[in-house]
Amino acid sequence: LDQSSCMICFYRIFYPKLKVYVIHHHFRYQEMSGIKRQLQYMLEWLGLGVSFAIITPNPYTHSLIKQMRPDSRTVFLEMAFKKDVPTCSCYVLKQLLFVGTVYQRKGLLYLLEAIGQMSEKERSGIHLDIVGDLSQKKYYKCLLSLVHLYGLEDIVTFVGRISDEELRSYYSRAYCFVFPSLLEGYGMVLIEAMSYGLPVIAFDNSAIPFTVKNDRNG
């Protein structure tokens, strides 16, 4: 379950005078179901409860913490972000880009299904680059099966993990950033994509609406 919460409780039990500050990104219990979800919720509740203060980078997570632990010392401290915007625009029309670890929470299944349900005319010219770690082999194979099912072999490319320099080139030539994540505590990659002038298509859930504003930047 959550090792961080266990460690916080350990320090508070054996070092009661120690002030533990926690930087909290998102709640892991939201990714679970059944008894695991209940146990994880309890661990996070305990961990936050014995913390001296909690720092969080997003109003969404801040509100959840206050619901869980109304008496907690919680500070919303927005994440600093510095990124040089490219001076030239060399995007490729209909070039879509996703950046993030390839696993279930990122919702790529829904993105591939959406493209797969397009007509041949609507798909024409579209290409999707999926950039990110592919270590979750079971989920990766599931996505490959979906690509094969919909005949998207020439449309979808799994790039894998790349260097920062290579990533900049992918951002520079992308026409639109797509991010079908089901849960985000912040979604820094959204800010990164916007720094390249990319419009963002994303689900309206968790912390995402605090960054992506409909008809303004996505």
Q: Which functions belong to the PLM regions below?
A:
Residues 182:
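Aromatic "clamp/platform" in nucleotide-sugar-dependent glycosyltransferases that forms part
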Residues 60, 80:
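Carbohydrate-associated surface elements
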Residues 94, 101-117, 128, 138-141:
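A conserved mid-protein helix/loop that constitutes part of the nucleotide-sugar donor-binding site
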Residues 37-54:
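Membrane-proximal helix-turn-helix segments that form the acceptor-binding/catalytic region
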Residues 132, 141-162:
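Nucleotide-activated donor-binding/catalytic signature segment of Leloir-type glycosyltransferases, i.e.
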Residues 161-162, 169-174:
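Short alpha-helical donor nucleotide-sugar binding micro-motif in glycosyltransferases
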Residues 190, 199-202:
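Short hydrophobic beta-strand element within catalytic cores of glycosyltransferases
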Residues 205-215:
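Short acidic/histidine- and often glycine-rich active-site loop of Leloir-type glycosyltransferases
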